[in-house]
């Protein structure tokens, strides 16, 4: 039993050292889908939706801002960017946005939240 206080003290010291080595992380998150839709002949949708998201992650050593944009036009048109996700992932200290694959700029969980927001607003 004499080893118990020494072991607890040693473990407390190790935990304190390990926890001090992690940096603090903060994030800002917002996803919005704005739609202007109506039904055409009670069947097909007509109008458009604009989906945007911003995910800013800051740690002790760096900061990254990821942006998402998708414009959806109903009925579909010939615009090659219709219904195409466009993303950027840029260090916060830079003004020129860097294009990025959306799967790199956003986590799978964040992309799922964007899709959920979009789906909820496209119902008419």
Curated annotation (Swiss-Prot):
Q: Which InterPro entries match?
A: DUF1505
Residue positions the entry lists as glycosylated: 36, 62
**Any signal peptide, and if so, which residues?**
1-23
Q: Any idea what this protein is called?
A: UPF0375 protein Y45F10C.4
Where are the bilayer-spanning segments? none
Give the UniProt family note: Belongs to the UPF0375 family.
Task: Give the UniProt subcellular location, in the record's own words.
Answer: Secreted
Going by the UniProt record, its keywords in alphabetical order are: Glycoprotein, Secreted, Signal
List, alphabetically, the GO terms of the cellular component aspect: extracellular region
- One Pfam family linked to the record: DUF1505
């Amino acid at each position: 039993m004499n080893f118990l206080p020494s072991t607890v003290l040693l473990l407390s010291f190790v935990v304190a050292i390990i926890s001090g080595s992690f940096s603090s992380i903060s994030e800002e998150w917002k996803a919005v889908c704005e739609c202007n839709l109506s039904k055409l002949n009670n069947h097909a949708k007509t109008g458009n939706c604009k989906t945007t998201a911003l995910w800013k992650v800051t740690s002790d050593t760096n900061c990254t801002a990821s942006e998402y944009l998708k414009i959806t036009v109903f009925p579909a048109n010939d615009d090659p960017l219709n219904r195409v996700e466009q993303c950027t992932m840029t260090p916060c200290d830079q003004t020129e946005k860097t294009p990025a694959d959306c799967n790199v700029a956003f986590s799978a969980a964040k992309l799922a939240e964007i899709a959920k927001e979009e789906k909820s607003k496209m119902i008419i």
